[in-house]
Amino acid sequence: QTILEEMFIPFVIGRSPHDAERIYEDLYDSQRVRGYFGGFALDAIAGLDMALWDLRGKLLGQPVWQLLGGKRHDRIPAYVSGLPGKTVAERAALAKEWMDRGFSALKFAGAVADAGELVEMAAIREAIGPGPKILVDLHWHYTALEAIRLIDQLCAYDLYLAEAPVAPEDID
């Protein structure tokens, strides 16, 4: 609440929600001197942006998807995010359950892979078979070189995507 009140509400008060794009740009630009790649400030900006689009839709009597240009796809791919089992075996079994329910992709958190990401990836791939996509969130845990080495090893299990392998500020 403090971030919103002290940093961003002054940019919004008195402005039209129909100007959501410009307001977002102003809010985002206001963070350039503080670093604008992540953190609570950008979370607050995202929340304000969504609220403005929602308000705009309510004022116009239209759903936000229409305001954003209308329907573009009949279906949108989705994946399961998170496997809250206590052990590798439980998480692999849960992955299989989700695939059996009709999902074709899942993401697991490398941070909770207590036996390591490779063991987790191998167990999940064995449980779900060769078709479904597997994504892993590495939670900014690695240096660039460590991430490259790990991702190369994960690719042996047909890794689809590695999310956040290095800190966003790590430009080396």
Task: Give names to the regions the model predicted.
Residues 1-59:
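Metal- or metallocofactor-binding catalytic centers and their adjacent structured scaffolds
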Residues 38, 74-90, 109-110, 137-144:
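Active-site mouth loops of central-metabolism enzymes
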Residues 53-86:
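Catalytic pocket of metal/acid-base enzymes, prominently hydrolases
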Residues 72-78, 102-104, 130-132, 158-160:
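Short, well-ordered coil/turn segments that N-cap beta-strands
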Residues 86-99, 144-150:
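Short, acidic/polar
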Residues 94-107, 112-115:
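Active-site gating/metal-coordination segments in enzymes
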